[in-house]
From Swiss-Prot:
It comes from Shewanella sp. (strain MR-4). HAMAP family: SfsA. The gene is sfsA. Disulfide bonds: none annotated. It comes from the Bacteria. Gene3D superfamilies: 2.40.50.580, 3.40.1350.60. Belongs to the SfsA family. NCBIfam families: sfsA. This is Sugar fermentation stimulation protein homolog. GO terms for molecular function: DNA binding.
Amino acid sequence: MHFSPALKPGKLLKRYKRFLADVQLEDGTEITLHCPNTGSMRNCLFPGETVWFSTSNNPKRKYAHTWELMATPTGGLIGIHSGNANALVEEALNKGIITELTGYDSLSREVKYGDENSRIDILLESAQKPACYIEVKSCTLLEDGQGYFPDAVSLRGQKHLRELMHMASLGHRAVLLFVVQHTDIHSVAPAAHIDPEYANLLKKAILSGVEVLAYRCEISPDEIHLAQSCPVRV
């Protein structure tokens, strides 16, 4: 995924009201960005460090600028836009980068499924094999060298695990795919210290036949894309 037009830099001042962030531009001007991340963004906020943002020409938007990337004090980069994860996975699937998920004839997005009024992020289908239901999660929380998901209690994430278990019980292929949008994360684990119920459900899901994958992103101010798999430690 190439950032076009090119992203612009600024210095983070603060994030507030969940969906807003103030940044200072190189000329000293302060602007407000839309923050496209519903999580706590735990360990992802570094006031004074560089952020990169995109700009929309849609006159109906209240905030024209969207926060895309965050630099870390150690020189790493974080993909702030959690909504990019699905598009990154679709791009990687089309290029055959996710080797565990090749050989399907069609790809659909946001298809209704399950018993709890859910929509699957990605559905892969083929006449020769069972349908493959893929839930995509963006992982950005880094603590003590380990990547974790979720970064806050996630009832929605718990629901999606139950839905995947149900799909697996029906004979479909069910996959949980972590998209690691943090260049310093090299493995992913359930955040039992944050959401113990999610961690327990993940273990049950694996025993029920749900596959769990994680892929790291290569990130720069020019582009972001899925690059290689990394371990999931349960």
